[in-house]
Amino acid sequence: MFPQEEKLIRERLGREPNDVERAMLEVMWSEHVSYKSSRKWLKLLPTKNEHVVLGPGEDAGIIKFDDKTWIVIGIESHNHPSAVEPYGGAATGVGGIVRDILCMGARPIALLDPIRFGPLEKEKNRYLFEYVVKGISDYGNRIGVPTVGGETEFDESLDNYTLVNVACVGIMKPEHLVHSYVTEPGLKLIIVGNRTGRDGIHGVTFASEELSENAEEEDRSAVQIPDPFTEKLLIEATLEAVYTGKVRALKDLGGGGLTCAASEMVGKRGFGAIIYADKVLLREPGMTPLEVMISESQERMLFAVRPEDVEELARIFEKYELEWSVVGEVIEEPKFIVYWKGSKVAELPIDLLTEVPTIEWPMKEYKIEEEVGIPRISLQEAFEKVWRSPNIVAKRWIWEQYDHEVQGRTVVKPGFDSAVLKINEEYGIAITADGNPNHCYLNPYHGAMGLVAEVVRNLVSVGAKPLALVDNLNFASPERPEVYWSFAETVKGLADAAKAFNLAYVSGNVSFYNEIVDKPIKPTPVVAGVGKVKLSKIPKGPNKGDVVTLVGETKRELGGSELYRVLGIRKGIAPRVNLEVERKNAESILRLINASLVSFVHDLSRGGLLVALAEVAALFNVGMEVTIKTDMNPVEFAFSESHGRYLVVLPERKLEEAREITDLKVIGRIIGSNSFSVKINDEVLLWNLDKLKDVYWNTLYRLMD
């Protein structure tokens, strides 16, 4: 807390808070819990459309899939913990977002993991990468929730640090909805799951400040300990309890522990709570009430239940061999009172915990965009560098550690523009996640707009109609004027783009203070999207003889591109989005797919056209012959990251009909031979298909050996 906040608290209370109260207030007034620096700006985001059942404000958002099925989605970051202890930090990040989905009354069915690291040439970055992936893999596999997609990026600005964002999707019936807040007094508050220990104490305050050079030693105790086996039992027990209709409210004990879960649960509708902290089951001897109230031990849920229903639910918990205890009750008076062995150890007005004043930090606009000349490099040399980039090559080294088919719903697997999960015999959902800190660093507003556009392109490329979005905003300290300005610009860009597509943000997360030893990260918003797809219409893949076509205009837009990154060029102008064109092209692609006119569609984004072509060849083991005439420099045309573009592969006999829907420029053909050949004006790129595939599929393995 800042000195002026402490002064405000003393004035409200008319006294100094005691140690327990101070610890609880520090948790609730932390940036991580209160969103005090971001709340004002987040109000700009659209949160309603015809698909939204429940927008931001609870643990996850809910979208209507059909009359019998709702989709639940949320996203969280676990950046600081993963930078300090990558295995435990990443694993508990998975556990936390899964419980957020669970406490709405939904079964978690899939995970996405947008993760970012420093360059793999450094041993520390390889260590963070290896153990973050292992943490996500072990936890997800053991609880039986598949990790079906995400994205992985390596950038110099993240040296010795990591950004670990995890999104989770769940499925539920409308009648099973449980809210995270109570609507009546007299309810009993029950903690179910793991015993409470000293792990994760001050976790949210540690996540609300920059990391020091010695963070690995100093902050390890703030990282929670993962226990996926208990989580698996907790999922089944919680759902069985929810299906009885006897659960009045439900919260995950995550950041801020019991203090946060209980105060938010009762405070939303103006109720209060009495907590008997000595009734909490402990894992370690000698714990104090302060430690009990702010511990962030994992795999714990807080149930609000009428007194007459406690016994019935307890039988369910015991059936799954989960420990439980009644730790408090909901009261009419808006106070949060804590007892320890008969003595009152804390008493605070509930709104002092839950209604934290906003902060508006000073802002300073920065302008770093400037025109950069076209690099003097051949098409062959440029492709050699970009195609070998860890940001471009296949992430199979990661997927192979994940069980992405558990639960049997996965229709389109990792490695494509979106993953697709079967919901019923006819329809499924497509899910995807995207970030682009290089574009957002050059221009936060246009970079953020481009991000939403890319999510839409990824969804429609598999035939899905976009329904809703969630956002995870990773930034450095808001106390830096340039950072706070870039945050506000990012939110404006996310809002304007979503409105253009009539999309709403149903949930989200803000993670500030992502910097280590005074080195701030680039603005890194991540957007995940969900869409509805008819399973029979998903494009299956290219066939020999198909024509390769391009939809959308390629412009002179290399700023923030992967080509510039591998060449060490940090300047440039970020690509601009024409929202009208983007929307029109997305609608056209959906029409092409629904009319069964195409074999395959791939969005153009990182790496540009040449990378998209090579990805199709490598993914499907097909030869390709491409010839392009342009008034642009061949390297610029090949690696521009202009928005609004798609590769569309289709049988030649369907070309005429497809052109009635949209303008398709034929640039090449799928061939039977073992070659990947691209000619742009007079420059020729020729690769053997086996070599192309070897680089794509095996580079990450070689880097991690």
UniProtKB/Swiss-Prot annotation:
**Principal cellular location given in the protein's record:** cytoplasm
Gene3D superfamilies in UniProt: PurM-like C-terminal domain (3.90.650.10), PurM-like, N-terminal domain (3.30.1330.10)
**Record localization:** Cytoplasm
Name the residues that bind substrate. 77-80, 99, 224, 296-298, 511
Name the top EC class.
ligase
Matching Pfam families, A to Z? AIRS, AIRS_C, FGAR-AT_linker
Q: Where does Mg(2+) 1 bind?
A: 76, 509
Biological role: Part of the phosphoribosylformylglycinamidine synthase complex involved in the purines biosynthetic pathway. Catalyzes the ATP-dependent conversion of formylglycinamide ribonucleotide (FGAR) and glutamine to yield formylglycinamidine ribonucleotide (FGAM) and glutamate. The FGAM synthase complex is composed of three subunits. PurQ produces an ammonia molecule by converting glutamine to glutamate. PurL transfers the ammonia molecule to FGAR to form FGAM in an ATP-dependent manner.
GO CC entries? cytoplasm
Name under which the protein is recorded: Phosphoribosylformylglycinamidine synthase subunit PurL
The residues that hold Mg(2+) 2 are: 100, 252
GO function terms (MF aspect)? ATP binding; magnesium ion binding; phosphoribosylformylglycinamidine synthase activity
InterPro entries from the UniProt entry: PRibForGlyAmidine_synth_PurL, PurL_linker, PurM-like_C_dom, PurM-like_C_sf, PurM-like_N, PurM-like_N_sf
Give the Enzyme Commission number: 6.3.5.3
Q: Which UniProt keywords apply?
A: ATP-binding, Cytoplasm, Ligase, Magnesium, Metal-binding, Nucleotide-binding, Purine biosynthesis
Pathway membership, UniProt: Purine metabolism; IMP biosynthesis via de novo pathway; 5-amino-1-(5-phospho-D-ribosyl)imidazole from N(2)-formyl-N(1)-(5-phospho-D-ribosyl)glycinamide: step 1/2
The answer on whether this UniProt entry bears the keyword Nucleotide-binding reads yes
Q: Does the keyword Cytoplasm apply?
A: yes
Q: Which organism is it from?
A: Pyrococcus horikoshii (strain ATCC 700860 / DSM 12428 / JCM 9974 / NBRC 100139 / OT-3)
* Oligomeric and partner information: Monomer. Part of the FGAM synthase complex composed of 1 PurL, 1 PurQ and 2 PurS subunits.
Reaction it catalyzes: N(2)-formyl-N(1)-(5-phospho-beta-D-ribosyl)glycinamide + L-glutamine + ATP + H2O = 2-formamido-N(1)-(5-O-phospho-beta-D-ribosyl)acetamidine + L-glutamate + ADP + phosphate + H(+)
Which residues are recorded as binding ATP? 35, 471, 508
Biological process GO terms, please?
'de novo' IMP biosynthetic process
Q: Which gene encodes it?
A: purL
Q: Which residues form the active site?
A: 32, 78 (proton acceptor)
The UniProt family comment states: Belongs to the FGAMS family.
